[in-house]
Structures are given as C-alpha cells and as structure tokens.
C-alpha cells in the first residue's frame, strides 16, 4: 500500500469536508450557487487528483486502502467544474469495481453525477435538485420503477429512505440560512 498517497488523499478529502461543514454551519453554503471558498478547494483538489490518476490510474483499495479509495472518489465526485474529467473517470472506476478495488456505490454516485451534468436521467437516484419550496427532489431517473433494485445491488438505501435523510439535511440547512 502507498501510505504517502493514501495520506495525501485523506488530507484532500478532509479539507473538502471541513470547508463544506464550516460553510454549512455558518450559513454561507448557498443552495443554488457555488461558494467561492468551496470552489478554490475543489480547483486545487481537481488539479492534484488529475495528476494522481494520470500516474496511478484509479486509486483502488490495494493501492491506498478503503478510506483512501473513498477519499479519491469524493474528490472526483466533487470535481463539478470538470465534467469531462468526471466522465473520463467513469470507465476507470468501472474497471476498479469489476476488479474488487472499489465499491459499486461509488460508481453509482459518479455515473449519476455525470448523467445529471449531461442533462440525462440518472440510474441510481443519487442526485437531487432544489425545489421551489426549498426541499430537495430527486433529479429525473431512468426506469424509475426499478431504481430501488439498482440501489440495492449497489448497497444503497431505498429512494424513500434516502429522500427522508436528504430532507432532514435540508431542514438543518434551511435553519442556517
């Protein structure tokens, strides 16, 4: 295992989380806009994760451990300023999942993010939009009747359970704004 790379990925993901939490708890994380502070963190992380993936490919469990693998996924998942890069990462993550190097739920989230950014219906129902009343609603879903089966296969909770959790987070966010 590459402990140095693992530590770097964990540090990058932690900075992302801490920045988001700080903005959220101070009421400075906008719902419909991109925080300039968060943007700076993402730009820095994007530049570095691109170099890491170019050098190592997808950073799977054997290379950086489960937590390092998840940290890399978080960084790519949050690379919303770089949709082409996210799209390029999908086949890399697909290969990692097939090899047992990454969990399917990570691929589900990334695929859905890429589909949403392309204006296409998502497969797993992981992406949400804000409604006019300030609540999150699932972004359009392909074959919605079977979404829970796909979610179950990926190790995700049902849409109902997930939407309930998201709405609880919305309430906390709305209290801060």
What are these regions (language model features)?
Residues 145-177:
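Acidic, proline/glycine-rich low-complexity IDRs
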Residues 34-35, 131-134, 176:
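A short, structure-level motif marking secondary-structure boundaries and short turns
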Residues 93-157:
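An amphipathic alpha-helical core segment
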Residues 1-117:
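N-terminal helix-rich structural modules
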